[in-house]
Amino acid sequence: MRFDAIVVGSGMSGGWVAKELCERGLKVLMLERGPNIEHGPDYSHELAGRLRKRDDQVPLEERQLHYPYYEGVAYALFNSNKKFWASDHDYPYETVPGKPYRWIRGYHLGGRSLTWARQSYRWAPDDFESNLKDGHGVDWPIRYEDLEPWYDHVEAFAGVSGDYDGLPQLPDGDFLPPFPFNDVEQAAKAQIEAAFPTRHLIMGRTANLSRITKAQMDVGRQRCEQYVRCHHGCPLGSYFSSLAATLPAARATGNLTVITDAIVESVTYDAAAGRATGVRAVDRLTKQGVTYEARLVFLNASAINTAALLLNSRSDAFPRGLANGSDQVGRNLMDHVSCGPVIGTYPGFEDTPYQADRPTGLYMPRYANVTETGKPYLRGFGFQGGAARRRRPDAEPDASGAPKRAWVFSLTPFGEVLPNPDNRVTLTTSRVDSWGVPLPVIDAAHGPNEHAMMREAARDAAAMLSAAGCTDITPWEEAGAKLTPPGDRIHEMGTARMGRDPATSVFNGWGQAHEVANLFASDGAVMASSASMNPSLTYMALSARTANHAADLLEQGAL
């Protein structure tokens, strides 16, 4: 069967592309390299509820072999849900000596949309103009106004809870009611904002349903019950994922075909026609090759895999990889950067109960080089954090005989990483995986801007906790020197950027390849910069916009 469109990848962006195309009447084939996951029955949510976390840890030897990136996702990777985390042993990649990279993946239907932290922020107008203003990277070919209606579109369907905060550096959206602050957070917010009036501590905006709408009920989703076992999959569909939301909507049209265990290794290309004709894939289980054909091809395999697919799709017409006349495929790999968390003990509130059942923390939007200028670095960062109780074994026991728990407040910065063409993905010429596909080689490191930014972020965090009255605050010099390695924040992007000029970019502002008109992408690969906010909501908006534009072109006979 020949399809109207092939979508490679079933995660955050691929699910949106499939939904939009199917609802426009296109026959869509979705290819997922990993196994099928059934929404609900294949989740570990109920099992995790019966286990103590300490009894659900991946054994040390297994962790060292399969999950060496564990440190960055220790909050979410457990023995009961390890199938949602790709094994570095089974799916290897290479790095450059002295430049570690943590590539954290989810190879199964739904991808990392099952395990993401659900933080959902619109980028600001300035984020689409920063490259132009300071000369790093290339200018975005779109502006916030181009994406604004698509932010509206995806928020209404996905469901994002949050406050209307009225901050230009973090645009408001179509929100469900926010989750509440606890008493300590309310007190700390007042103290911090009084001491630093240019900074704002807000409730995190999260893709958890604090209230149900018809759009969500129509695909079988339910209101969030705040079990806080989201990383095990939610059988209620209370947080947004491909399995809970976009794929049910796509399937409801009757236009979607899903094939799992299909490892796409390259895009096929007809040089005479100047068009992509489909993809070549390898069956994960049988290792047999198969070719699928379609009028349109969408790459939504995640930034590194999308770049690897293009690089491996070489031909006489494109000896450096498909659509790579600019030599930009694989370049400008970005993530976000954090330093060590800054934590302080918050006094008082000893009799205030703590319920660890909120599916989001607090957020402080960027202020550096926005409301506070003259910084010794470009761009900026936001903070994620909140207040919780921590066990104090040295304290007097409470009435039940259990050790008292002190309130602690933590802040962790997430900083923007500048585009750098030397941070890149290539393919090894000497090693292939179990399916005969060349391994990606990742060469990336943080630069002086990221180091300077994190040093100040740690100092700022300590100053804010001090203003809130905290004691025993993490030494900021210590925290600011501990940068997360690239990849650790799980926001990889930028390997096939969109831009205005085919000489310096791979895709145009619609996610359409400059050199191959029926080839599209809308995952992290197309990002021209990284901003300071989590990128998933922007991936969703770009995907909906790209898919509808492609459908328009097909209807007009332009493809």
Give the positions of each predicted feature:
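N-terminal Rossmann-like FAD-binding beta1-loop-alpha1 element of flavoenzymes
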Residues: 5-30
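Residue-level detector of alpha-helix initiation sites
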Residues: 7, 11-12, 183, 304, ...
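Glycine-rich loop(s) and the adjacent beta-strand/alpha-helix scaffold that form part
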Residues: 23, 27, 34-54, 236, ...
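Short, glycine/acidic-rich hinge or "gate" loops at secondary-structure transitions
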Residues: 39-42, 161-173, 471-482, 556-559
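FAD cofactor-binding and catalytic pocket of flavoenzymes
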Residues: 82-112, 116-117, 122, 135, ...
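A glycine-rich dinucleotide-binding beta-alpha-beta segment and adjacent secondary-structure elements
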Residues: 202-210, 227-230, 259, 265-268, ...
